[in-house]
Amino acid sequence: MYSGRRCSGPIADLKLASLKRGLLISAWLLAAIVSGGGCGASLPSTDLPPSREVVAALEFPDLRDYRGIVDCRPSATGVDQLRLAELARAAQIDFICLADRVSKPTSNYGMPGFTSQVLFFPGGSFAADGGEILGIDLRDPIEPALEAPRLIEQIHRQGGVAIANHVDRFSSVSDYAAADGIAIFSLAQAWEAAGEWRIFLRALLLGPDRFFGALDVRPLEALRLYDGMARGTRVSMVAAMGAEKRLGVLGSTVGTFEQFMLISTTHLLAPERQPSPMLDALRRGHAYISFDFLGYVAQFAFYAVDGEHKTMMGDEAAFSPTLSLKVQLPSQADEIAIVAGGAPVARASNSDRLESLVKSPGVYRAEAYRGGHPWILSNPVYLR
């Protein structure tokens, strides 16, 4: 029988510690709520310029630097294309590749062309062999139950671009070996990996930049798979977005398109903003990824130079002992690295540029970091 006396010992101490911890967490949450410290419906502090001005690509003035979204899925939350275009214009987005999930054969992949001055590419996403295949610039129906190699074949048959997404979930690299590109980062996948409760608490307690920064983690496995594939063939690197999440946090909403469009973008370097040259840039890897909440990126260059000849991202050149690789950033990064085979071969700290002589043939790409998070990831230069 319980004597009415206060218990002591390890169990009582554990209960007391748990109670104190619970009270501390409750007080912390209450302070965050009262102070409005969480991100709520706040936007990341992406320092967009006053208006969108498309600029020439650094070192390649015949091309323009267009920023956009690959893998946008508006139907999941009922956002129509006109509203999506309005959100894109506010975020200074130049193009969007639509990718709603395809569950049955359809020719409704969204409206192609310009909507409110934003260029849309119709397309869809197909679940396949554990991962996903994104089809860009689609018109004709495709059977979604096909295996990944057949899906890629059907996308190519109608002139579309095939991107492998969630590559770490495929059972084999051979499933997506014929794809034009790989999405090495997926905002939706990063969200899912964090877990809804962790997302909720972060949104409650952290400001928007720290909250979204927690999702911006170097995608180690995807980069490993990408580097392995790029050793044997040229393949484009992009970032995927996915569907908006719209998580309710005390009357606010987190994970909206309005927020996501300010986090990361895929840049295409093309002579004009028309479907054909833009798709060509995507196929050829004339592209790079930027996480703009760490600093708006209007221009970036990674290229090889040998005398007067320059080779841009996505292109191939013959190796020469006089050849060097150059990185040019729009502003200073905490760290810049030139990477080959997943390992850095040259580094610079607190700089906006890096140059290095090349010692051997290989597949080289550039990475720039701020605050320990990826800021800019380039497509490779292939030196054979």
Language model: regions and residue ranges:
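Hydrophobic alpha-helical membrane context
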Residues: 32-33, 83, 112, 254
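A metal-dependent hydrolase metal-coordination microenvironment
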Residues: 43-202, 206-207, 212, 216-224, ...
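C-terminal motif of bacterial Sec signal peptides marking the signal peptidase cleavage site
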Residues: 37-38
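Bacterial N-terminal signal peptides
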Residues: 25-34
